[in-house]
Amino acid sequence: MKKFHFIAIGGSAMHNLALALHHKGFQISGSDDAVFEPSKSRLAKAGILPEVLGWYPEKIHEGLDGIILGMHAKKDNPELQKAILLGIKIYSYPEFLYEQTQNKTRVVIAGSHGKTTITSMVLHVLSYWEKEVDYMIGAQLEGFDTMVHLTDENDFMLIEGDEYLSSPIDRRPKFLWYKPHVTLISGIAWDHINVFPTEENYIEQFRTYIDSIMPGGVLVYNELDSVLEQISKESQNTIRKEAYHVPEYFIEEGVTYLKTDEGDLPLEVFGEHNLSNIAGAKWICQLMGVDEAEFLEAISSFKGASKRLEKIGDNGSSFLFKDFAHAPSKVKATSDAVAQQFEEHHKVYCLELHTYSSLNPTFIGQYKNALSGADQAVVFYDPEALKIKNRIPLSEQQIKVAFGTENLIVFTEPDEFQEFLLNHSWKKSILLMMSSGNYGGMDWDALKKHVLSF
């Protein structure tokens, strides 16, 4: 039985990989200095939750087949140092996935935005038709126990390909490990400025990625992204290239319909970005053996990935949506989708700035007009988060100028922000909450109850 130890086992991706390997019959151990829900309960149920928090070099021994190193660990981590000393093979998360899938057809979904949704769409369609594949996805999907599934027998491996760094000691983007046979790139919008300081540096990662596609492979790309189209066409890699765009659709009584040769198809999701995602997912599914009619039947029941334009509640008049959007292109796409779908409603868009990039004075201008579809735009950020990072807090004026939106309110106190929401009248209104954080501790139950009381 193979034995692997996870350094930083509690992370979203890491604990899912640990569970997948445990289910595959490997012996798994791990460490972390903090483990939160749902990781904690899921690891405990499998019997692989660390008994005590912290880093313990004595857990590292020559009987291990390898170490899987998470991004949360630091370079000077005592367990990592012991593993280096003993000469144990140290894998980054993506490197290990590649090792496990060398004999499979690797299908990778990449791009600055839409990765999780497109991967979820493909997985939903394959599951609908009971087609078994291995997979790694970046969000919990309804009907799937884990975000990672690995077998010896499945032919395909579907991977959500992230451009962020592989590990603390491997500064390559994760997706450069995967060497796909088939890949989709949804778009390129500068992100992760803490590791890609210039836009050109960021774009260069995607150029390198396109060149890493296996010879004879297929690149599916969003032709409406001019930068992506250019670098796709420029690549000299011996691959097939297929472009996609937003398909024909219309909205009637709050429902989005896709125009198809088989007739008008009602969808559970909405927004041009999601329609574009559907067009891309269709290409990938067809390349994985699902025909167009089968795809359309299955996609009509897709409700969306967790935290992506997730409807928390509605009463027919008022709606509360939650979205993971935080990068400028994602915020703009989500905002525009809601504005188009709910033209008659009063719309309040709230965005929390809490990532390294979003709070950077040189980057915040990328958010210009991102909230322009709102009747009332709100930005929340916690100055304490900047102090922890030894950064100077942004002024209210800096934020207003950056967003270029007249009707913008800025909150820096969680209590004041919640008070604003709980004193607002939500009759025939849309409240869209966008963040990869939690607004300083949002009481979602109280907010939902209030919004739906009108």
Feature-to-residue mapping (PLM):
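ATP-dependent carboxylate-amine ligase
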Residues: M1-E37, L43-P50, G63-I67, A83-I88, ...
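Short pre-catalytic strand/loop immediately N-terminal to key active-site residues, enriched for Gly-Thr
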Residues: L265-F270, S318-K322
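Phosphate-binding loop of NTP-binding sites
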Residues: A20-K24, E58-E62, M71-Y221, V227-T238, ...
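Fold-independent oxyanion-binding glycine-rich loops
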Residues: I9, S31-D32, G70-H72, Y93-P94, ...
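A generic structural signal for residues located within well-ordered alpha-helices
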Residues: T117, H273-A279, H326
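Short, flexible loop/turn motifs enriched in small residues
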Residues: L176-Y178, F250-G254, G304
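Short polybasic amphipathic segments
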Residues: V255-T260
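Beta-strand->loop->alpha-helix junctions that form or flank phosphate-binding loops
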Residues: V52-W55, Y91-Y98, M136-A139, S235-E253, ...
